[in-house]
Amino acid sequence: MPPIILVFFLVLIPASQQYPFSLESLNDQIINEEVIEYMLENSIRSSRTRRVPDEKKIYRCGRRIHSYVFAVCGKACESNTEVNIASKCCREECTDDFIRKQCCP
């Protein structure tokens, strides 16, 4: 019998049977951690402004405001004022006139 197989039978098999390792308890622990993480995610409130529009008002955030400015002005915003239209339009409804006054030359 080759020596490597002999080592396998004499050392590794008895050692693996003495090692107190249970896959079932490990799986239970992983599932418990996932449940706790899921419950914590649901209990934490978002600190961002709400991005879901009301029935009548349309809020534009991120890429939507960029596309909206292109649609109204035909090019990127060239604002000379201190008004941050991205924050304003994400919090409240912005009209075409507001965008024209702030961005279009």
Curated annotation (Swiss-Prot):
Name of the protein: Insulin-like peptide 7
InterPro entries registered for this protein in UniProt: Insulin-like_regulatory, Insulin-like_sf, Insulin_CS, Nem_insulin-like_b-type
Chain positions listed as propeptide in the UniProt record: 19-57
Domain of life of the source: Eukaryota
GO molecular function: hormone activity
Effect of inactivating the gene: RNAi-mediated knockdown extends lifespan.
Entry GO CC: extracellular region
Organism: Caenorhabditis elegans
Family, similarity comment: Belongs to the insulin family.
Function according to Swiss-Prot or TrEMBL: Insulin-like peptide which plays a role in ageing as a consequence of daf-16 activity.
Gene3D superfamilies: Insulin-like
One Pfam family here: Ins_beta
Keywords from the named record: Cleavage on pair of basic residues, Disulfide bond, Secreted, Signal
GO biological process, one term: olfactory learning
Keyword Metal-binding appears in the UniProt entry: no
Signal peptide from the UniProt entry: 1-18
Record's subcellular location: Secreted
Disulfide bridges in this chain: 61-90, 73-103, 77-104, 89-94
